[in-house]
Amino acid sequence: MKCFQKLYIFILILIVLMAGCESNKITGDSKETQIKKSFAKTLDVYPTKNLEDFYDREGYRDGEFKKGDKGKWVIRSEITTELKNENMVSKGMVIRLNRNSRTCTGEYFVRIVKEDSEGKVYSDERKYPVKMENNKIIPLKPIDDEKVKKEIEEFKFFVQYGNFKELENYKEDEVSYNPEVPIYSAKYQLKNSDYNVEQLRKRYNIPTKKAPKLLLKGSGNLKDSSVGYKNIEFTFIENKEENIYFTDSIYFNPSVDK
């Protein structure tokens, strides 16, 4: 009789443990879904065709902000290409939108990274100061290089045309979230038919047919719409000989730098 009682108790404990494991699995799946939905919500800034809309957009605030400071948005888009036996070339633009003064300045940049015969690496970067008025980027100084001048005139930030409405349908390789910081990240394998990939290929010379991986990183409270910073990277090729990737970032900082 005692043997039967022990067996009964053992089976009962086993059932409880199995139920607990199943419950944890469900909770985990639900959390993953919640993170993906939260990503979709915080990525609502894509697209924002009129950059001046950021003057009225609130962001995630930490202890660095002083009372009364509305903060500033820092927006950056950059394409980097390094082909076999060639220099690494990065081109992009960064602007800073001050919500207190409602003014915006920044620079367009061209950076070339070279390696000499001895393996030493050198970086040559040229910056062209710009400002934004009426949602238009305007050079602050005369530019003799017609190619650079045209690149500035035609430049669009990824936030102006990127769209993540299909995010929930993306197949993630990895998703993580730390609510205490709070920071979060997600990695996806995209297809060339993806809208954002098509837009990047339309605007940039991307010398590969390989579909990119998308990496999203950010900070801010996923329970509301505030944003601290957001990094987006489309990696087409990444190895020791060749690199092709596009990066986009949106930061919300105090208006006065330390």
From Swiss-Prot:
<feature type="signal peptide">
    <location>
        <begin position="1"/>
        <end position="20"/>
    </location>
</feature>
<keyword id="KW-1003">Cell membrane</keyword>
<protein>
    <recommendedName>
        <fullName>Uncharacterized lipoprotein SAB0395</fullName>
    </recommendedName>
</protein>
<keyword id="KW-0449">Lipoprotein</keyword>
<keyword id="KW-0564">Palmitate</keyword>
<dbReference type="InterPro" id="IPR038641">
    <property type="entry name" value="Csa_sf"/>
</dbReference>
<dbReference type="InterPro" id="IPR007595">
    <property type="entry name" value="Csa"/>
</dbReference>
<comment type="similarity">
    <text>Belongs to the staphylococcal tandem lipoprotein family.</text>
</comment>
<feature type="lipid moiety-binding region" description="N-palmitoyl cysteine">
    <location>
        <position position="21"/>
    </location>
</feature>
<dbReference type="GO" id="GO:0005886">
    <property type="term" value="C:plasma membrane"/>
</dbReference>
<keyword id="KW-0732">Signal</keyword>
<feature type="lipid moiety-binding region" description="S-diacylglycerol cysteine">
    <location>
        <position position="21"/>
    </location>
</feature>
<keyword id="KW-0472">Membrane</keyword>
<dbReference type="Pfam" id="PF04507">
    <property type="entry name" value="DUF576"/>
</dbReference>
